[in-house]
Amino acid sequence: MEEKVILVDENDQPIGLMEKLEAHQKGLLHRAFSVFIINSKGEILLQQRALSKYHSPGLWTNTCCSHQRQGEDNLQAGKRRLWEEMGMQVPLKQVFSFIYEAPMGNGLTEHEYDYVLIGFSDESPSINPLEVCNWKWATPEQIQKSIAETPEEYTAWFKIIFDKFYHFIAENITL
């Protein structure tokens, strides 16, 4: 089954559906979400993408991210993928959204209207090896330092999203 993404305008109004790979090849704006799980120590759960992924294999990124299905709201989509990728069931809250564009250097471009979702858990994930090859907890400061020192180890979108998320948690969350 081909996975379709929801094409949107800059106001997040749906304008059509397209196969995911084609949307990434054409760099068309589509709806997406990014989940961040934080533990009681203030650490963020990161995943290393499976080596079999068609883009950004083996790179580190946020807890999980994907695309909403037609008729699915952001929180439903986030919970679905958090379970499918990380084997976790965690209440999520939508905290902000923004548009970004990130060429991935292989003829593909992420151009997303991204909803950032947050959840809190001390649970260890039970990863799906088709999606994820490794995971770790890291403080925001450790992540920021690692991105600065080894940016090639992180997905293009995570580097953009993390900067916004870092400022959000610094201003809004007491850990």
Q: Model regions: which residues?
A:
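Acidic, metal-coordinating catalytic segment for phosphate/diphosphate chemistry
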Residues: M1-S34, S40
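A residue-level structural signature of the nucleotidyltransferase/glycosyltransferase Rossmann-like core
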Residues: V5, E43-I44, W135-K136
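A structural signal for short, well-ordered beta-strand segments
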Residues: V35, C64, Q94, Y115-L117
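Short alpha-helical functional segments enriched in proximate histidine and acidic residues
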Residues: E85
